[in-house]
UniProtKB/Swiss-Prot annotation:
Family that this chain belongs to: Belongs to the G-protein coupled receptor T2R family.
Residues of this chain annotated as glycosylated in UniProt: N151, N167
Extracellular side: 1-9, 71-101, 150-187, 257-266
Keyword Metal-binding annotated: no
Name the UniProt record assigns to this protein: Taste receptor type 2 member 7
UniProt source species: Mus musculus
Cited CDD domains: 7tm_TAS2R7-like
Length: 312
């Protein structure tokens, strides 16, 4: 790639990462301040903070990988030195997805209304189960991340750089099957939390449909609090699903780069697209939470006042 292309893509990556880190840091900071003030933290705030922190780490790792690929290609080609980056990318990737899945599950049990004994048992205990569930997500992510990182051979990154592939064509061809196997396993693992979130979304739709059949809306179109809660939860879950699909496609591009003519460019484009998911979803979560939305309005008002004061 040319110097101009490298510079442009790097600026875009840095801009995306900074916007996402700012949004996720805001979520974590607001919830942390509320925790310090009240000496306790609500389950929803704990989940949102976990999602935000995992995505801050994920965005930093993606940005670091992108910078090393462009600015330090020799370091990028050394699989042993980059194995740490691979591990933390895989770990934060799984944590981010699993924590977001926990958010979908929490919305389902808090808002939906079903009368199955198991559903009611979990619904009554969901607040007590959240911390255990988040810890289980950490353990699951670690269990998947360690084997995957070990299975990534040292030749993988050499296949990304075109100049290295010229001298290592045979080696790359030999290892393509192994790389493809790791890639397929990575994407299959991500399919399970996606399916759980999808089922949660479908059950929320079913619950909303049953709820609207039991109530009568007024002439003005007023919706009761339960209906509003259903709609808000569905918006949050569907936005996660849509952005997660985009992220998986980007992840597929990045991990399949060794099959493509311009491997380095494919990796960078994959990482740029991947940054959209954690960056965009943070602002959707802020707008979907009354607490975070009010805090953001207060911050914007203060910034606006400060800017006006500087003008005069």
């Amino acid at each position: 790639m040319t110097y101009e292309t490298d510079t442009t893509l790097m600026l875009v990556a840095v801009g995306e990462a900074l916007v996402g880190i700012l949004g996720n840091a805001f979520i974590a900071l607001v919830n942390f301040m509320g925790w310090m003030k009240n000496r306790k933290i609500a389950s929803i705030d704990l989940i949102l903070s976990s999602v935000a922190m995992s995505r801050i780490c994920l965005q930093c790792i993606i940005l670091l990988d992108c910078i090393i690929l462009v600015q330090y290609p020799d370091t990028y080609n050394r699989g042993k030195e980059m194995r740490t980056v691979d591990f933390f990318w895989t770990l934060t990737n799984h944590l981010s997805v699993w924590f977001a899945t926990c958010l979908s599950i929490f919305y389902l049990f808090k808002i939906a209304n079903f009368f199955h004994p198991l559903f009611l048992w979990i619904k009554w205990r969901i607040d007590k189960l959240i911390l255990r569930t988040l810890l289980a997500c950490v353990i699951i992510s670690l269990c998947f991340s360690l084997p995957v990182t070990e299975n990534l051979s040292d030749d993988f990154r050499r296949c990304v750089k075109t100049k290295e592939r010229i001298n290592s064509t045979l080696r790359c061809k030999v290892n393509k099957a192994g790389h493809a196997s790791v890639k397929v396993n990575l994407n299959l693992v991500m399919l399970f939390p996606f399916s759980v979130s999808l089922v949660s979304f479908l059950l929320l739709i079913l619950s909303l449909w049953r709820h609207t059949r039991q109530i009568q809306l007024s002439v003005t179109g007023y919706k009761d609090p339960s209906t509003t809660a259903h709609v808000k939860a569905m918006k949050a879950v569907i936005s996660f699903l849509a952005l997660f699909v985009v992220y998986c496609l980007a992840f597929l591009i990045a991990t399949s780069s060794y099959f493509m003519p311009e491997s380095e460019l494919a990796v960078i484009w994959g990482e740029l697209i991947a940054l959209i998911y954690p960056s965009s979803h943070s602002f959707i979560l802020i707008l979907g939470s009354s607490k975070l939305k009010q805090a953001s309005v207060r911050v914007l008002c203060r910034v606006k006042t400060m800017l006006k004061g500087k003008k005069y």
